[in-house]
Regions:
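Cys/His-clustered metal-coordination modules, chiefly Zn-binding fingers
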Residues: 99-168
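Amphipathic alpha-helical membrane/lipid-surface binding segments
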Residues: 4-119, 123
Length: 168
């Protein structure tokens, strides 16, 4: 594996660690909602920075990616309604960041009906950013790129576009 591939694999592992720690802290709390999620995400970031899983700067970047993915997961689940319960069933998704996000979604239930407009708008993913598994759609040519696990957003294989929307 080349150094660049090793770095990407390490970042994907760090992202999954952050997602799993966030999941653990959020589900351990009594409150459900966006504010509780933000607190759990910040605590997960602080903990993993303290134990040297990543630098403060790397952790901040991963935290932003996870927050974006969480917003997208919630928005997508709200759009799908009942179908989301089946599609985002944690036992169906296996391990990794997407499974952690799905578990949080399952336990949160209707709390997110009052989310801010941010989660209702389309969230843009850019080449090079970290994200969980899902289907990215190129904004330039509508080509679909399927990510089977956490990783970096690649350029579009059809048109080399760098901006995507995401579904699951």
């Amino acid at each position: 594996m080349e150094k660049n591939d090793q770095d990407k694999a390490k970042r994907a592992r760090q992202y999954d660690l952050l997602a799993n720690k966030f999941n653990e802290l959020y589900l351990a709390g009594k409150e459900r909602g966006r504010e509780s999620m933000s607190v759990a995400l910040e605590k997960a970031h602080e903990h993993l920075t303290e134990v040297k899983e990543f630098s403060e700067e790397q952790g901040e970047e991963l935290k932003q990616y996870l927050s974006r993915d969480l917003d997208q997961t919630i928005a997508h689940a709200q759009h799908l309604g009942e179908e989301a319960k089946e599609r985002f069933n944690p036992s169906r998704l296996g391990a990794g960041a997407l499974s952690s996000l799905a578990t949080v979604l399952e336990f949160t239930g209707n709390t997110f009906r009052s989310l801010s407009d941010k989660t209702k708008q389309t969230i843009t993913y850019k080449t090079g950013e970290m994200t969980s598994a899902g289907t990215l759609t190129c904004q330039a040519c509508s080509q679909k790129v399927h990510l089977k696990h956490t990783g970096h957003v690649p350029p579009c294989p059809k048109c080399s576009g760098i901006l995507f929307t995401k579904g699951y």
